[in-house]
């Protein structure tokens, strides 16, 4: 079973696991392929770890913890990836100001995003999180205002957001983030050509230099840049998507479920890249419902519930308990019965 829970809700995953347990009792065996560590520990008995196409470790889940598995997958000690000391590097300059943003699935969303800041926006499925992400890249219409570097954006205009230095690394990477029929090379410099290129003719040596720079900086693993983008792993595809926006020199980057469906090692690389972008003065918004992801990178977190901001959590308030409390609207029930 290859990533069977990717498009399932929590309830549906529980139902799937119950069916698997029953089939196991009947003598059915499973090979379960997933990047979601909690699922593996819940449903699997034994594990095999592959890295760079080779078997590097195997054993039983009852003899190891998540850190041990992760270290085997990435090939290094997790002590090198301690995000607990993350310090906000934001300045006072507002990169994006959102006021009373309202559209299908969300209402009255307002916040300021500063240069060097990493803002997380989270919420359960149906909270409006995905729709807000789309609105902030001009994918869907909205009312209210979005001001980018002092300029008011036109709702529903992707090209307008792109021209004003807003970039998106989208969810559903294969459907929305890459051009499946084009090569790795062509995918990487596409945003640059659309937003920055002013000449009539393309200078191949310039494009080669740009590709080489991003390939090295992002550690994109490919034998041939002319291979189709679909020949890459999910993690390397995600790096290409990020690389094309870095080449376009975007000021504001929207990461919508940035590590969905990629391996643990590449996840850590993406987290470090996000922190590096913030240190370089970029403004970043990360849309995710995975708490470990939020905790690793966020300076501040907006928690959505039924399309509205239910809480704004600072770094010192960002705990899994608080995120779930406000994501489920539990605070509203407490207020109702107070």
Q: How would you label these PLM feature ranges?
A:
Residues 1-338:
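Glycine-rich phosphate-binding loops of nucleotide-dependent enzymes
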């Amino acid at each position: 079973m290859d990533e069977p829970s990717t498009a399932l809700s929590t309830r549906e995953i529980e139902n799937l696991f119950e069916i698997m347990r029953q089939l196991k009792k009947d003598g059915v065996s499973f090979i379960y392929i997933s990047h979601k560590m909690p699922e593996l520990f819940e449903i699997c008995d034994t594990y095999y770890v592959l890295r760079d196409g080779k078997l590097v470790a195997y054993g039983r889940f009852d003899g190891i913890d998540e850190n041990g598995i992760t270290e085997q997958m990435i090939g290094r000690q997790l002590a090198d990836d301690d995000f607990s000391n993350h310090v906000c590097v934001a300045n006072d300059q507002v990169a994006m100001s959102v006021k009373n943003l309202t559209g299908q699935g969300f209402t009255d969303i307002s916040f300021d995003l500063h240069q060097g800041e990493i803002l997380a926006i989270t919420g359960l499925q149906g909270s409006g999180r995905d729709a807000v992400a789309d609105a902030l890249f001009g994918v869907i219409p909205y009312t209210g205002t979005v001001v980018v570097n002092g300029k008011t954006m036109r709702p529903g205009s992707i090209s307008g957001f792109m021209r004003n230095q807003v970039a998106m690394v989208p969810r559903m990477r294969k459907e929305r983030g890459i051009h499946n029929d084009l090569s790795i090379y062509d995918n990487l410099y596409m945003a640059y050509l659309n937003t920055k290129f002013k000449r009539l003719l393309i200078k191949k040596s310039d494009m080669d230099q740009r590709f080489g720079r991003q390939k090295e900086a992002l550690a994109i693993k490919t034998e041939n840049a002319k291979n189709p983008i679909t020949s890459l792993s999910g993690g390397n595809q995600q790096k290409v998507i990020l690389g094309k926006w870095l080449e376009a020199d975007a000021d504001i980057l929207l990461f919508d479920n940035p590590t969905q469906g990629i391996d643990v090692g590449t996840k850590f690389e993406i987290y470090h890249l996000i922190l590096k972008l913030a240190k370089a003065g970029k403004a970043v918004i990360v849309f995710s419902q995975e708490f470990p992801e939020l905790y690793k990178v966020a300076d501040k977190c907006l928690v959505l519930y039924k399309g509205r901001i239910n809480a704004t959590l600072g770094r010192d308030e960002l705990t899994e308990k608080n995120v779930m409390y406000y994501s489920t609207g539990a605070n509203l029930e407490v207020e109702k019965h107070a």
